[in-house]
């Protein structure tokens, strides 16, 4: 059987809908041989019970994390691979980032309440890593918010629409979250023994209007080892954009390693599933071997 890999998957430890164990089960079902759980600012998924479960299922699991950073008002995500998930300094640094998210939650909740929305701060604050997605989901699933949502949107919005209209920069409930720069995140990852990869560069072209040259400057500043070139981006019109060929060539030109990731959060009819099984991205066995060799060296 040809190997299949997916190096960017989220779980309920951050903003995914499946537990780490359920992610493993889904990977088995889809015949994906090697995965990396890369939750936001946490490595909580990597507990001994999961490692044992992965061993029983015969899947390769590469320890990973996705750190949220900011530079020049652009939100940049940095992936770390083959990190020491028990490194005490690294765990303390991640804890600091998560604590900043709790401060962010309270500030956003205050603005949302002024706008007429009820937010369950007590429930959300119990999450390991609270994100915009968690807050938006809490808002739009509350019956108490139905009238306000219909007043503001003319209909019941989905999670993404609520975030883009109410919570993003320039919107009424926007709050700037205290975080680290890409360079600082890269240093955290290296100090934990990991490889540094810029997540989904395609997204920064569409969300932040960054040119490839500007993206390259960020890559150079953080001294990234590679980029997540094989990736399906979903734009604001819910259209799939595949620039994998462009970013693979970009990586080759600038002597960067490449990775592949679904950025899986949940099962729906739009976003790629684990392993990008239904997408037109096909890696050769040699390409997969080279990726794994790079990450594990």
Residue ranges of each PLM-predicted region?
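An N-terminally biased module of ancient metal coordination in phosphate/nucleic-acid-related enzymes
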Residues: 1-74, 176-268, 278, 285-295
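Extended substrate/RNA-proximal surfaces in nucleic-acid metabolism proteins
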Residues: 55-214, 285-291
């Amino acid at each position: 059987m040809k190997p299949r890999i997916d190096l960017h998957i989220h779980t309920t430890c951050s903003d995914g809908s499946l537990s780490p164990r359920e992610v493993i089960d889904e990977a088995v079902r889809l015949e994906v041989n090697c995965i990396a759980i890369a939750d936001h600012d946490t490595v909580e998924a990597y507990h001994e019970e999961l490692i044992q479960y992965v061993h029983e299922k015969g899947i390769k699991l590469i320890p990973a994390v996705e750190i949220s950073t900011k530079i020049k008002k652009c939100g940049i995500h940095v992936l770390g691979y083959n990190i020491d998930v028990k490194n005490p300094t690294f765990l303390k640094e991640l804890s600091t980032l998560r604590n900043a998210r709790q401060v962010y939650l309270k500030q956003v909740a205050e603005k949302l309440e002024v706008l007429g929305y009820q937010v369950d701060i007590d429930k959300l604050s119990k999450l390991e890593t609270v994100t915009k997605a968690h807050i938006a989901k809490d808002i739009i699933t509350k019956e108490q918010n139905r009238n306000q949502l219909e007043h503001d949107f003319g209909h019941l919005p989905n999670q993404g629409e609520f975030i883009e209209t109410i919570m993003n920069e320039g919107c009424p409930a926007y709050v700037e979250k205290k975080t680290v720069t890409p360079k600082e995140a890269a240093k955290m990852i290296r100090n934990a023994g990991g490889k540094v990869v810029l997540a989904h560069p395609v997204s920064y072209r569409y969300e932040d209007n960054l040119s490839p040259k500007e993206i390259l400057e960020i890559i150079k500043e953080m001294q990234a080892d590679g980029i997540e070139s094989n990736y399906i981006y979903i734009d604001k019109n819910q259209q799939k954009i595949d620039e994998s060929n462009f970013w693979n060539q970009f990586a080759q030109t600038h002597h960067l390693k490449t990775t592949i990731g679904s950025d899986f959060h949940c099962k729906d009819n739009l976003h790629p599933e684990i392993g990008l099984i239904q997408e037109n991205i096909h890696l050769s066995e040699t390409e997969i071997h080279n990726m794994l060799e790079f990450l594990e060296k």
